[in-house]
Each structure stands twice: as structure tokens, then as C-alpha cells.
Regions:
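Basic (Lys/Arg-enriched) interaction patch that binds polyanionic ligands
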Residues: 174-224
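Conserved small/polar residues in nucleotide/adenosyl-binding loops
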Residues: 226-233
Length: 233
């Protein structure tokens, strides 16, 4: 609860600073739970025109930017950039996971809230981060696990990255949230209920504690920190 109150206070401070001083302000990267807190405050913060920015369309981690061209009369720059990590020797490159890339960044002393989404595309990875740490990543990240890598800053629009999806078909008794979570992630209703109570289920970016709400076509459901009971690497 203390962390939640601190975040609410910080959001209000950044909102007031942006509005009173006519300058753009930003949070660090927020996870989905933190974004849910922001969503609950959104109407209260609306006078400073806040928006979520993650660097790409389907973000899960994002910064809140306060301010707009309409409000200030000038366009602000979002301090979020994209780095592409590539193997130096493609022939000897390992198959690296999200955890591998994140661990390599954390080993450089980079704090988690400065890093956004990490998207993997074959032997390449795209990492969104705050602009002021891109230099550190480019200069110091030269190895992920046993694979030698090099880093370059890229424009996201020019990467050609295509979001990949896994299609799953099935029948559900109703369009309730808990039913769909169980079906989509192959979980028992009991585990789905535990995830909801543990604040790990989000519907269109808002945290859900009850599985009874109805889901519509096009809605987005996400679950955090679920580990399959079957062993896997």
C-alpha cells in the first residue's frame, strides 16, 4: 500500500509541475499494476493531458507523459528510445530469452524502472529504455550469456518488427473474465481465482480482483508472473 501511495503522490506532483510550469514531465517505466493505479487516477490528472507511451503499439510497460502541444503550444519529445541487440557472430549465437537480456542489463547496474519492453525477434532483441541510459547500454553491453553482441540505437518504425500471436481455439460457457483466463492460459478455475486475488490479472490495462466481469471482443487480458507447473526451461 505504501508503494501505491508513493506512486499516486508522484503522479500528482508531475501533473501539477507540467501544468504550472508549462513543461513536459514523465514518470519512469510503469508495469501493468502501476499503470492500473494511473488509470484509476486518470480523470483526476486529466487537466495536464496525460498519456501512456511505451515506444510501440502493443506495449506492456510504459511511461506516463504529462502535457500536450494543445496545452503548451509546442511539441514535446518522449525520452524513450529503442536499442537493437544483435549477435556479433550469428553462426555461434545462442537462443536467448527475455530473462537473459533483462539479466544482462541488470548486471550493468541498470534499474528495472529504466527499461521498458524487451521484444525478441529470432536472434535479435529490441529493448525500449529511457533515453539517458542508451549510451551505457551501447558502450557496456557486449555479451548476453555466452553470446557476444553489439548494440545500436534504431528507429522503431524502421525495424520491420511484426508482433507474433499464438492462436488458440476453444469453447467457453460464458464470456466471464475468470472463464476466459482459464481457457486462454490452460489453467484450472482455482488457479485463475488465485491469480485474480493476487492482483496479477489485467483487463484493458486495469487490474481485476473479480472474475465476474464480462469480456467483449477486442478486449485485452494479461496475466503476470504465472509459472507453468510442468517443468520447462
Amino acid at each position: 500500500m505504501k508503494e501505491e501511495e508513493l506512486l499516486k503522490k508522484r503522479l500528482m506532483e508531475l501533473c501539477e509541475k507540467a501544468y504550472n510550469q508549462n513543461i513536459y514531465t514523465y514518470t519512469h517505466f510503469l508495469n501493468e499494476y502501476e499503470q492500473s493505479i494511473y488509470q484509476d487516477m486518470k480523470q483526476e490528472l486529466a487537466y495536464a493531458h496525460p498519456i501512456l507511451v511505451g515506444g510501440h503499439k502493443y506495449f506492456t510497460r510504459a511511461v506516463v507523459m504529462f502535457g500536450s502541444e494543445e496545452l503548451f503550444g509546442y511539441q514535446g519529445e518522449v525520452p524513450v528510445v529503442c536499442a537493437r541487440i544483435s549477435p556479433v557472430f550469428d553462426k555461434f549465437a545462442e537462443e536467448l530469452s527475455h530473462r537473459d537480456y533483462l539479466g544482462a542489463l541488470m548486471n550493468l547496474g541498470i534499474e528495472r524502472h529504466l527499461i521498458g519492453d524487451i521484444l525478441i525477434d529470432g536472434r535479435y532483441a529490441y529493448i525500449f529504455c529511457m533515453e539517458h541510459i542508451i549510451g551505457v547500454i551501447k558502450e557496456q553491453l557486449d555479451q548476453v550469456r555466452h553470446t557476444r553482441v553489439f548494440v545500436e540505437e534504431v528507429s522503431w518504425e524502421e525495424t520491420g518488427y511484426v508482433q507474433k500471436y499464438k492462436k488458440k481455439e476453444g469453447f467457453v460457457a460464458s464470456m466471464r473474465l475468470d472463464v476466459l483466463v482459464s481457457q486462454a492460459f490452460s489453467l484450472s478455475r482455482n488457479i485463475s481465482e488465485k491469480l485474480l486475488k493476487s492482483q496479477k490479472v489485467f483487463h484493458n490495462g486495469k487490474m481485476c480482483l473479480s472474475g465476474g466481469q464480462k469480456i467483449k471482443q477486442g478486449d485485452i487480458i494479461s496475466c503476470l508472473l504465472y509459472t507453468s507447473p510442468s517443468p520447462r526451461d
